[in-house]
């Protein structure tokens, strides 16, 4: 599967980003490269290969360098107010963002 210029223009419109002709051409090349890689991965024979929880776990000599899932700071109203003060628009303790899906 390969994307043409119209496909890239449609993707850009859906993502609501404006691309110059040069950017559109580069995006087309990059997206087609990604799709080619995906096709190669899908063609790989994985029959009998057990799924991995993480790709690094395939290597015995490499320890997983994943950080523990631990709370690093306690939530507070002061911190919440500080974060919301940086938002362009906030109401009732929530960030307000423009509608992006029609």
Swiss-Prot record:
Listed InterPro entries: Asp/Glu-ADT_sf_sub_c, GatC
GO biological process entries: glutaminyl-tRNAGln biosynthesis via transamidation; regulation of translational fidelity; translation
E.C. designation(s): 6.3.5.-
Pfam families reported for this sequence: GatC
Catalyzed chemical reaction(s): L-glutamyl-tRNA(Gln) + L-glutamine + ATP + H2O = L-glutaminyl-tRNA(Gln) + L-glutamate + ADP + phosphate + H(+); L-aspartyl-tRNA(Asn) + L-glutamine + ATP + H2O = L-asparaginyl-tRNA(Asn) + L-glutamate + ADP + phosphate + 2 H(+)
GO molecular function terms attached to this record: asparaginyl-tRNA synthase (glutamine-hydrolyzing) activity; ATP binding; glutaminyl-tRNA synthase (glutamine-hydrolyzing) activity
Domain of life from the UniProt record: Bacteria
Keywords: ATP-binding, Ligase, Nucleotide-binding, Protein biosynthesis
Family statement drawn from the similarity comment of this UniProt entry: Belongs to the GatC family.
Binding partners and assembly: Heterotrimer of A, B and C subunits.
UniProt cross-references to NCBIfam families, sorted A to Z: gatC
Function: Allows the formation of correctly charged Asn-tRNA(Asn) or Gln-tRNA(Gln) through the transamidation of misacylated Asp-tRNA(Asn) or Glu-tRNA(Gln) in organisms which lack either or both of asparaginyl-tRNA or glutaminyl-tRNA synthetases. The reaction takes place in the presence of glutamine and ATP through an activated phospho-Asp-tRNA(Asn) or phospho-Glu-tRNA(Gln).
Name assigned to this protein: Aspartyl/glutamyl-tRNA(Asn/Gln) amidotransferase subunit C
Annotated organism of origin: Bordetella petrii (strain ATCC BAA-461 / DSM 12804 / CCUG 43448)
